[in-house]
């Protein structure tokens, strides 16, 4: 048995409960929802900015709360492309990373 199948058949697994996410405390969750709703290259921008910001955080060049600031700055600055192609996604990702590194490095 794999993954969730094991829990379904094993009565010793505790029940899972979920609460609504606190989008004020976890701003990136709200930004991710907005990017998903917007579509196009918005998720590529979000991902590139998040990866760059987390990298800077791990290097102790950025505080944890600034990760959301960096992602939001990139989403605001990178022009969105509704026509999602591989090239458009890669370009949006690169632009987002460039913005984060330029602004927060």
Briefly describe each language-model feature range:
Residues 4-5, 9-105:
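Catalytic, metal-anchored helix/loop core of enzyme active sites in primary metabolism
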